[in-house]
């Protein structure tokens, strides 16, 4: 964890991933016990509904702030299945430790560097936040959809 992350009490990628998976599981289990269908579950995760009914799901909900500028932002996946991370780093280039990357190399992604640590910025990308994408990759178990995100063997 970088000094920046410690100073601002940020979670590591893996801590966030596990915490988010648990929050997601609780909501989906609740909806499943109410006999929600796949389509109803997807609709439930629309930004406006989540802000109202699940305000603890995302820190941005308190400000009614979207992480992506989309009219019909769907928060089912929150993170992207194409996001790859390792808290120790995926690679080091020119003294910069890259902790995350996009597996499809989206032209809408970019990086920001703080204290020689590079992080992927996906805020301009909409790939995982559309109903069509979510329908195609849907699973009630968020971790199954996201299983390739955590890279256990970083590149040399």
Question: Which residue stretches match the model-derived regions?
Answer:
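Cysteine-centered metal-binding/redox modules
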Residues: 2-156
